[in-house]
Amino acid sequence: MKHVFSTSLIVSLFVIFTDAQTFQYSRGWTNGKRSSPEQTAPSRTLLPHIPLGMDKPDEECRLLIQRFLKSPCDVRLANAIVNRNKDLLRDMADDVNDGTALLYDPVPMVDTAASEDVRFKRGTPDRRLLNDGMHRL
């Protein structure tokens, strides 16, 4: 009788935890709060902690920084913020609007080759094939 009670207790707790987790993730609840339909950008979290070098940045500069912080891997953005150069920030905005800005430097990736194990494990294409396709363009 003891085994039946303990087994039924374990199974019922498992069902309760599974249903609670399914309800939590299927309804959009995270950490006890309802997730907002609006996507939370990282810039809202990071913007107050960035030293801008200006007591009150103008609205255009603030909006540009928020826009660029959505893709924080751009090294030029970090340099612009560190150097507090508003002109460089506006030039970057022009580059993004023109479609000429890169979020990363492709040169280090050209000469590196992924090992066979990693390449086949992740299903990534061979870099040599990608480079050949880029040279044809």
UniProtKB/Swiss-Prot annotation:
Modified residue annotations for Pyrrolidone carboxylic acid: 21
GO biological process, one term: neuropeptide signaling pathway
Modified residues (Asparagine amide): 31
Pro-peptide region(s): 68-137
Keyword Secreted assigned: yes
Domain of life: Eukaryota
InterPro entries named among the record's database cross-references: Procorazonin
Extent of the signal sequence: 1-20
GO molecular function: corazonin receptor binding; neuropeptide hormone activity
Cellular component annotations (GO), alphabetically ordered: extracellular region
Alphabetical keyword list: Amidation, Cleavage on pair of basic residues, Neuropeptide, Pyrrolidone carboxylic acid, Secreted, Signal
The family this protein is said to belong to: Belongs to the corazonin family.
Functional note: Cardioactive peptide. Corazonin is probably involved in the physiological regulation of the heart beat.
Name listed for the protein in its UniProt record: Pro-corazonin
